[in-house]
């Protein structure tokens, strides 16, 4: 019966899985981090040179000096990777550039090596170490440079057209028509001009010349009629140039020369305008005649220019066959080429050569129109040419005759990837351009005879731009280092945000939506929930990025004559794929590669078709090429609703590495490659035999008898404060092959990804403890450390120089008992291995206080002992709330030891504290199908429901969580898991090609489990069986990084905001819980006036009141009445700042003087005694008047009222 279990597949040398896949793997997965590493390699080998060649040579304004680039080299890094991490430094290498300075007057040449700053290096796994932390440069998905056409309908239902020429760097050029069919142009987003103005500015002044060039077009005719010039052609060209200058530089004096040079600089100057190789490729492709000729009726006969043989006659409709015959001729430089001579007044005086073919209009079959291409412009011409402009305008007019196609902006043929190499190059170019200006200025200032390249170069702008990019760019991100899968996904992430991209506020629904071109290129499932949904995507498993930045996906070629599927692989971009019909990978094949079925399900563009095998051009390589690595790790993905699959993919990245992880019993076969390529596993460089193994190192004797030594990472803190630890996966004497995993990283077992555990799970409601997705777990999970994880946090203390003297790290701390110092060494630093709790001292530190006026006693002491009592305050580093644990490591950095420290810092101490966190109530857990929940109860093992053989289940999940969520994959995984466990095997069920329902039931039957997959379950408390049979099985379950220890928080006495004097918010600030508007309504509704009053005063921002209340509580007295909240004063001050005269009135509309409004001490103002205060002031006035009238000394007024009693002297 073992034949039911699929076929055995080895993943590494330590794991065999039974795979249910039926489709043979014809293509190996590419390396999953290549998208990062290959791009950076290109940058180091070619990108840097390309950039220097673009910027140099730099000449001075007189042309006497020129600075040229010769070569560059990267030297050895200053720090190793480990040293860079420890010292909070960058892992970078010095860049040295050889420059040649030529003096053209004397012919003297000076060559010199110039240091160009430290350049960050990429690690082997595709990350950068910046300031000691690992960072990743996320690839960016942007609109490709090129020319794009679109159409729309105006309010009257008329079709209007538009076109945009988008460069990589430079001004945009836009064409548009309006409701009257007039054609306009916008240059660099300015106000529109008639399109004919641009054509005239290129040097084609007369109307007949323009009409002749573009053929008959209504839109052109109407525009010419509107743009009437009575002047001769040449002066019209000058007028057009001035019109454009007026638009671009309004208000400035215009001359023909300045207008000409401005337009030239905007579009035709290679230094100012850059299409990049990809823009040139896209423009040549779009404007080529091949794309427009198909199905057009020719208005002229086409013949071979050499032999005169007729290829197609006038009146012929161009079919695929005719187009195939024409194609080689269209690529020639002597076929249907037409040259136009522009006026000398135009932007560029050179003749313009284009390729033209005449056809009949589809709208009016009598009318002849021209199809024009830009000729054959070389791939290295990265600026626009007049031929590009004319051909793009011609295409624009052709669209109005139903010739040509509009473009879909969200099509992946029009969106490209900017990878790390290109992003770095762009940033470096910005720095070099700034440096170029400095060099030019210095050339004109310095003495020509003595100047050297070193004196001309200022590397500060270059260093600053690179530093800014790595430090603060939106695309330079702190690496997600929760687990290897999170790391790998981060490296393969594609973001549409960032400089030059979209912003999440302006991104509409269309940009975020799944597009048919995502198939095999971007994962349709994995994307964040929330405001970034659809803007951040993940590269599909088999996708690669080509040299132009377009994503390609592999397909198996179908032979065009035999119609059999071959093993030849073609990588296709999205726009090339649009030309073919492609069958799915699940289409059944015969042994010889022919299709079994007469009708095959296939795709063409966005349509799903049923076609005969002879129509098919390509076939998918494997079903999982559609999804990303994380989605490909979800078994039975095809049985989950996509929203839940999205959550499942995201939850896997949040799994915490456990102490003793296990790979899933039900896997997908993706686990080995994900772990291998993540960069966290240690991999053998060459084949050999393991000679020595311990926890810290592995030694392998190669076949050529050389010895390789591999050092393992031990208990390092990861970016996500998790424990990064490697453990050997091989034994002494074992033979290894090259590229095999020899040591597991975090969350790995036997070279496979192991994000969680395989507990026994029952779908059972239990005393309402799993209400609303809550999870009930067995105490065994806690006792046996099944879900225990290790967390490492680091804390730093710096001793700085202050104005009053240097801070000191010491054991002698004022007003601290000996018991608080028990774990500190003689220097005042905590010992390794000490167990510390919240508030314990880690590093003793004192800071000088300002010298105060000495008291008589201190003066006496000073006179006797001759030294001033040291005035210092305790600024020791203490364990923050929830940070207790065991001190794992202490690092001390001092200048004496040769460590680089920031200015003003004399000594720095870093303490690592390790916590062992067991699973507990409040922790979040999840499966791989988006079935998440928090733990509501840790139930004693003896009370858990148990199986007929006495085994208690480990976890109880609510069965109500399955039907409405439609993630049935978890139920299938549950049954298959228990069957595999009973049979003692691991299984692989790849996505879209895994175990069918029949396979699963066959395996369940073979394992001897009931045919419904359910079992009788007994109540652990009573021993009675539950009424119904219950689904019990094994499902992979993860502990997520959202742990209650990091979230739980209660404020006692804490900090207040400076302006409003209200408590801060959030755990990090030790803040309070906001009692918001709706909570106030609730208390108002209950009529709880006193509770409400104290919440709005003492507990919030009544500064005096809270102090008095505190004093009263300490002394055991009655709590005084509250006073004025600080926010009321802030409101008054803000209104006063607007120039409003604010008066506070009592209930009788009498004014109260808020003298304390200006008084910093914020004292005697009581909102409850407003009328009382008014009375006091009235009495005072009367008393003063009486005193004036009476010559005798006035009778003393009773003062007891005006100096309010301590009860009244409160705050709000």
Curated annotation (Swiss-Prot):
Functional note: DNA-dependent RNA polymerase catalyzes the transcription of DNA into RNA using the four ribonucleoside triphosphates as substrates.
Recorded catalytic activity of this chain's protein: RNA(n) + a ribonucleoside 5'-triphosphate = RNA(n+1) + diphosphate
NCBIfam families assigned to the protein according to its UniProt record, in alphabetical order: PRK00405.1, rpoB
Organism of derivation: Lactobacillus gasseri (strain ATCC 33323 / DSM 20243 / BCRC 14619 / CIP 102991 / JCM 1131 / KCTC 3163 / NCIMB 11718 / NCTC 13722 / AM63)
One GO BP annotation of this record: DNA-templated transcription
A UniProt-annotated Pfam family: RNA_pol_Rpb2_2
SUPFAM superfamilies tied to this protein: beta and beta-prime subunits of DNA dependent RNA-polymerase
Protein name: DNA-directed RNA polymerase subunit beta
């Amino acid at each position: 019966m073992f034949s039911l279990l699929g076929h055995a597949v080895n993943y590494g040398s330590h794991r065999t899985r039974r795979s249910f896949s039926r489709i043979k793997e014809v293509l190996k997965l590419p390396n999953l981090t290549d998208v990062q590493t290959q791009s950076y390699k290109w940058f180091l080998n070619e990108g840097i040179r390309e950039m220097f060649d673009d910027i140099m040579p730099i000449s001075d304004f007189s042309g006497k000096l020129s600075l040229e680039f010769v070569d560059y080299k990267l030297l050895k890094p200053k720090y190793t990777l480990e040293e860079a991490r420890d010292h909070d430094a960058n892992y970078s290498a010095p860049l040295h550039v050889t420059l040649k300075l030529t003096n053209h007057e004397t012919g003297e040449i000076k060559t010199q090596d110039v240091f160009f700053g430290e350049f960050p290096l990429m690690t082997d796994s595709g990350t950068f170490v910046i300031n000691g932390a690992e960072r990743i440069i996320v690839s960016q998905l942007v609109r490709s440079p090129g020319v794009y056409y679109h159409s729309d309908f105006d309010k009257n239902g008329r079709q209007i057209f538009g076109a945009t020429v988008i460069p990589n760097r430079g001004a945009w050029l836009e064409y548009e028509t309006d409701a009257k069919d007039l054609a306009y142009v916008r240059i660099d987003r300015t106000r529109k001009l008639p399109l004919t103005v641009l054509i005239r500015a290129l040097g084609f002044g007369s109307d007949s010349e323009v009409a002749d060039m573009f053929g008959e077009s209504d839109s052109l005719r109407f525009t010419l009629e509107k743009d009437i010039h009575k002047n001769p052609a040449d002066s019209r060209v000058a007028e057009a140039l001035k019109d454009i200058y007026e638009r671009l530089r309004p208000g400035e004096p215009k001359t023909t020369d300045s207008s000409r040079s401005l337009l030239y600089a905007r579009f035709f100057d290679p230094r100012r305008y850059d299409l990049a190789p990809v823009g040139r490729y896209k423009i040549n492709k779009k404007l080529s005649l091949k794309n427009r000729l198909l199905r057009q009726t020719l208005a002229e006969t086409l013949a071979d220019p050499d032999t005169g043989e007729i290829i197609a006659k006038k009146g012929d409709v161009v079919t695929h066959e005719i187009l195939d015959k024409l194609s080689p001729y269209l690529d020639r430089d002597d076929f249907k080429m037409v040259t136009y001579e522009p006026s000398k007044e135009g932007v560029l005086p050179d003749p313009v050569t284009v390729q033209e073919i005449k056809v009949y209009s589809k709208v009016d079959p009598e009318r002849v129109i021209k199809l024009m291409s830009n000729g054959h412009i070389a791939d290295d011409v990265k600026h626009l040419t007049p031929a590009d402009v004319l051909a793009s305008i011609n295409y624009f007019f052709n669209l109005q005759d139903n010739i040509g196609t509009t473009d879909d902006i969200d099509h992946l043929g029009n969106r490209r990837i900017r990878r790390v190499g290109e992003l770095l190059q762009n940033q470096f170019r910005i720095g070099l351009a700034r440096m170029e200006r400095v060099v030019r200025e210095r050339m004109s200032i310095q003495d020509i005879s003595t100047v050297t390249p070193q004196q001309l170069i200022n590397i500060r702008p270059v260093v600053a731009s690179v530093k800014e990019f790595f430090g603060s760019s939106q695309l330079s991100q702190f690496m997600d280092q929760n687990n290897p899968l999170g790391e790998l996904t981060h490296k393969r992430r594609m973001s549409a945000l960032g400089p030059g991209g979209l912003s999440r506020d302006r991104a509409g629904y269309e940009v975020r939506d799944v597009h048919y071109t995502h198939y095999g290129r971007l994962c349709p499932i994995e994307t964040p929930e929330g405001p970034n949904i659809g803007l951040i995507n993940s590269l599909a498993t088999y996708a690669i990025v080509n040299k132009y930045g377009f994503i390609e996906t592999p397909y198996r070629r179908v032979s065009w004559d035999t119609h059999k599927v071959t093993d030849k692989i073609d990588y296709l971009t999205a726009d090339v794929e649009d030309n073919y019909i492609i069958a799915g990978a699940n289409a059944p094949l015969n042994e010889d590669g022919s299709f079994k079925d007469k009708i095959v399900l296939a795709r063409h563009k966005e349509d799903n078709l049923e076609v005969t095998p002879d129509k098919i051009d390509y076939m998918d390589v494997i079903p999982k090429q559609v999804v990303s690595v994380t989605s490909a790790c979800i078994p039975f993905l095809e049985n989950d609703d996509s929203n839940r699959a999205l959550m499942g993919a995201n939850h896997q990245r949040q799994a915490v590495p456990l102490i003793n992880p296990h790979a899933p019993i039900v896997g997908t076969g993706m686990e080995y490659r994900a772990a291998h390529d993540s960069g966290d596993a240690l991999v053998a460089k060459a084949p050999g035999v393991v000679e020595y193994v311990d926890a810290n190192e592995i030694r392998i004797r190669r076949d050529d008898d050389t010895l390789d030594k591999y050092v393992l990472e031990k208990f390092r803190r990861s970016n996500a404060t998790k424990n990064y630890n490697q453990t050997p996966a091989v034994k002494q004497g074992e033979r290894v092959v090259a590229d095999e995993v020899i040591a597991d990283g975090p969350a790995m077992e036997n070279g496979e990804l192991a994000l969680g555990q395989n507990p026994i799970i029952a779908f059972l409601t239990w005393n309402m403890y799993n209400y609303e997705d809550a999870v009930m777990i067995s105490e065994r999970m806690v006792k046996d450390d099944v879900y225990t994880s290790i967390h490492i946090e680091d804390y730093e203390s710096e001793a700085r120089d202050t104005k009053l003297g240097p801070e000191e790290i010491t054991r002698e701390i004022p007003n601290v008992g000996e018991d608080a110092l028990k774990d500190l060494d003689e220097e005042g630093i905590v010992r390794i291995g000490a167990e510390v709790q919240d508030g314990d001292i880690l590093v003793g530190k004192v800071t000088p206080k300002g010298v105060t006026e000495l008291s008589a006693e201190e003066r006496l002491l000073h006179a006797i002992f001759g030294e001033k009592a040291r005035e210092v305050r305790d600024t020791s580093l203490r364990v923050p709330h929830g940070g207790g644990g065991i001190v794992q490591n202490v690092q001390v950095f001092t200048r004496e030891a040769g460590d680089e420290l920031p200015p003003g810092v004399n000594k720095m101490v870093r303490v690592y504290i390790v916590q062992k966190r067991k699973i507990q109530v409040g922790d979040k857990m999840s499966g791989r199908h988006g079935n998440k929940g928090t733990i509501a109860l840790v139930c004693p093992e003896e009370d858990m429901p148990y199986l007929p053989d006495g085994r208690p289940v480990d976890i109880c999940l609510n069965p109500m969580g399955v039907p409405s969520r439609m993630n049935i994959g978890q139920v299938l995984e549950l049954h298959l898991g228990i069957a595999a466990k009973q049979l003692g095997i691991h299984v692989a069920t790849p996505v879209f090609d895994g175990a069918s329902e029949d396979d699963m039931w066959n395996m369940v039957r073979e394992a001897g489990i009931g045919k419904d997959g359910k079992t009788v379950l007994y109540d652990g408390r009573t021993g009675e069986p539950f009424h119904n049979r219950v689904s019990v099985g094994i499902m992979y379950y993860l502990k997520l990084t959202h742990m209650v220890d990091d979230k739980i928080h209660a404020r006692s006495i804490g900090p207040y905001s400076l302006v409003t004097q209200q408590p801060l918010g959030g755990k990090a600030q030790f803040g309070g819980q906001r009692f918001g508007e709706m909570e106030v309504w609730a208390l108002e509704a209950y009529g709880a006036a006193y509770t409400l009053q104290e919440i709005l005063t003492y507990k919030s921002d009544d500064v005096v009141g809270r102090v008095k209340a505190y004093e009263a509580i300490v002394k055991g007295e009655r709590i005084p009445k509250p006073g004025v909240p600080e926010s009321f004063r802030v409101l008054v001050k803000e209104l006063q700042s607007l120039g409003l005269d604010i008066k506070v009135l009592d209930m009788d509309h009498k004014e109260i003087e808020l003298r304390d409004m200006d008084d910093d001490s914020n004292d005697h103002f009581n909102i409850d005694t407003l009328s009382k205060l008014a009375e006091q002031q009235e009495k005072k006035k009367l008393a003063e008047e009486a005193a004036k009238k009476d010559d005798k000394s006035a009778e003393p007024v009773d003062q007891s009222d005006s100096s309010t009693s301590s009860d009244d002297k409160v705050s709000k």
